[in-house]
């Protein structure tokens, strides 16, 4: 992506009349003023060349020795100093053309230089993007943001946000800002709390998401809402999750069914990919996979569909097996899983030892496998299986000579997740297409799950989702068989968002919570304001909230979320540039009626 793309407007004043990256042979012989940063400086045989950089790109400036005062001033320039240049645009000679930059056919012969800000020595170079520690980059983020890659990431993010707004406005969505100071909720992640000066002992919370507000907007009669919403969660950092603050495309629609929302989202992602990226969508409409199916086939509810491996259920092959480990896991709630890896049956022992080590890290007791070689099946499992079982396995999986089959056995969910982890581990054997976007919807999540620790039925995901079958399902079906109108959208193994068709009926909500062990009084005390709103006329509604940061990561091929955020925190939730979090004065604490009590370990620090 060129920095210059879309930059056509120029304010003409004493600092500049044009942008560096937009100059071309059409303005040859014209006088221009440019302002920017000294990107590079070279002295070639009496001529000084300056690469001047602004937001749009780079333009080469030539200072000729005949201009003695100008030449002397140019000699004193430091890298990253801010200067303004006045000069004339000329064509470069054919041998001097630089095809790597948009302005590479021209250069500007300087007639005047003014130094607006002379730069001191830099903590790290901008022009040569050498490896620099993340700590230093975050401390001097304003320097880091001058570097091409991250600068372009931030420009891309801005344009993506604008494209999202245009698309949704064309679909009759209304952008509405919801409160930043709201009430704390015990559910979900930890809140960031803000003490109230006017109400001693009480606290606001920064919103983890505008969930309740957007549902109340549906009750208010707004048919389609969206917001590029800041969200705050006091949680640990990961490569794809920023601690503290993140942004999501928050959406909600009234009078819709699940398929309506899918159509809107698929259209938007298709539009954004086609107009802003060279990537391509693997399958459209996006495939829809039930939670049960996605766990059985991929071992995760966030599958990377580019990985050419699938998990197979082979439980039925071992119902009468003499191999007790497999036979014992054919009972209800357990399973035997197999994964065929083509062409890897002749790998070294080290290959299998490393795989087994990874399986143990995932929680398995080991990793059983069978190598299908020219001289017959080999491996630690072969002696325990009959010829009939091996033949049935070959036929079911389509095994050929040179292949290997890995196995897992145990409780269903744990076995699925271990095999899914091994599927991801073996993905390194393949070259995945980085330009392919393998979207999918994961649907039909279970409404409830059994809590082994508390020996009770619990909600498995979102308690405010509408159960499939509504009240009839709650009254007539075993709780663990009830499905919810909940869905995730996943791309290349990254969950972009969860969403749901909401439960807007108080009678169904009370019943759903009753099954999970909550009384009507419990529900009213926790969610009374929502229940009251739903009693006063609530339409059917549903929504979703894709993470903006993660979407930019995918489209820009970034592995670290901090590469797509202008001013991120580090992994310890610290802003190294601004020095936050920081201590506050005793006066500020007294105004808020607060007293700080540090943990003993922290008090001991000098």
Swiss-Prot record:
Cystines in this chain: none
Q: Which family does it belong to?
A: Belongs to the class-II aminoacyl-tRNA synthetase family. Type 1 subfamily.
Per UniProt, L-aspartate binds at: 187, 233, 461, 502
Stretches for region Aspartate? 211-214
What catalytic activity is recorded?
Answer: tRNA(Asx) + L-aspartate + ATP = L-aspartyl-tRNA(Asx) + AMP + diphosphate
Q: Report the protein name in the record.
A: Aspartate--tRNA(Asp/Asn) ligase
Q: Which organism is it from?
A: Chlorobium phaeobacteroides (strain DSM 266 / SMG 266 / 2430)
- Which CDD domains did the record assign? AspRS_core, EcAspRS_like_N
The answer to whether the entry has keyword Transferase is no
């Amino acid at each position: 992506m060129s920095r210059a793309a879309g930059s056509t407007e120029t304010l003409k004043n004493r600092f500049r009349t044009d942008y560096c990256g937009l100059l071309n042979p059409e303005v040859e012989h014209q006088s221009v003023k440019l302002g920017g940063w000294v990107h590079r400086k070279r002295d070639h045989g009496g001529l000084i060349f300056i690469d001047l950089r602004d937001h749009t790109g780079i333009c080469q400036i030539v200072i000729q020795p005949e201009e003695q005062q100008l030449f002397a001033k140019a000699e004193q320039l430091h890298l990253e100093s801010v200067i303004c240049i006045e000069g004339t645009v000329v064509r470069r000679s054919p041998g001097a053309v630089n095809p790597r930059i948009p302005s590479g056919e021209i250069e500007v012969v300087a007639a005047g230089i003014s130094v607006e800000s002379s730069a001191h020595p830099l903590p790290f170079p901008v022009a040569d993007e050498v490896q620099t520690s993340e700590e230093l980059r975050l401390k001097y983020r304003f320097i880091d943001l001058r570097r091409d890659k991250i600068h372009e990431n931030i420009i891309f993010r801005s344009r993506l946000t604008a494209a999202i707004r245009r698309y949704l406005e064309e679909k009759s969505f209304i952008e509405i800002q919801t409160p930043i100071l709201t009430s704390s909720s015990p559910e979900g992640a930890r809140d960031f709390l803000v003490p109230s000066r006017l109400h001693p002992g009480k606290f606001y919370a920064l919103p983890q998401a505008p969930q309740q507000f957007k549902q109340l907007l549906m009750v208010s009669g707004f048919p389609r809402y969206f917001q590029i919403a800041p969200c705050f969660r006091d949680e640990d950092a990961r490569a794809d999750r920023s601690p503290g603050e993140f942004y999501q495309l928050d959406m909600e629609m009234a009078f819709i069914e699940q398929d309506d929302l899918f159509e809107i989202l698929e259209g938007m992602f298709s539009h954004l990919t086609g107009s802003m990226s060279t990537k391509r969508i693997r399958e459209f409409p996006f495939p829809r996979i039930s939670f049960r199916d996605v766990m059985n086939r991929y071992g995760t509810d966030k599958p990377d569909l580019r990985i050419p491996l699938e998990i197979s259920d082979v439980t039925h092959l071992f119902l009468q097996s003499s191999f007790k480990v497999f036979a014992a896991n054919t009972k209800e709630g357990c399973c035997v899983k197999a994964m065929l890896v083509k062409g890897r049956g002749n790998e070294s022992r080290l290959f299998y030892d490393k795989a087994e080590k990874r399986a143990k890290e995932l929680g398995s007791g080991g990793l059983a496998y069978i190598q299908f070689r020219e001289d017959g099946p080999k491996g630690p499992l072969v002696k325990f299986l009959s010829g009939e079982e091996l033949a049935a396995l070959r036929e079911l999986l389509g095994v050929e000579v040179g292949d290997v089959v890995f196995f897992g056995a145990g409780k269903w969910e744990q076995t699925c997740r271990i095999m899914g982890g091994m599927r991801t581990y073996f993905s390194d054997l393949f070259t995945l297409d980085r330009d392919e976007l393998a979207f999918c919807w994961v649907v039909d999540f279970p409404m409830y799950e059994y809590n082994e620790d508390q020996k009770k039925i619990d909600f498995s995901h979102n308690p405010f989702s509408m159960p499939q079958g509504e009240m009839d399902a709650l009254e007539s079906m075993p709780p663990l068989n009830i499905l919810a109108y909940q869905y995730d959208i996943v791309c290349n193994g990254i969950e972009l968002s969860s969403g749901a068709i909401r439960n807007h009926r108080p009678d169904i909500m009370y019943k759903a919570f009753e099954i999970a062990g909550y009384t009507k009084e419990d529900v009213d005390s926790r969610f009374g304001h929502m229940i009251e709103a739903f009693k006063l006329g609530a339409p059917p509604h549903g929504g979703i909230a894709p993470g903006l940061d993660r979407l930019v990561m995918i489209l820009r091929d970034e592995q670290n979320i901090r590469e797509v955020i202008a001013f991120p925190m580090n992994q310890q939730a610290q802003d190294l540039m601004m020095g936050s979090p920081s201590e506050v004065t005793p006066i500020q604490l007294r105004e808020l009626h607060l007293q700080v009590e540090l943990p003993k370990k922290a008090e001991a620090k000098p």
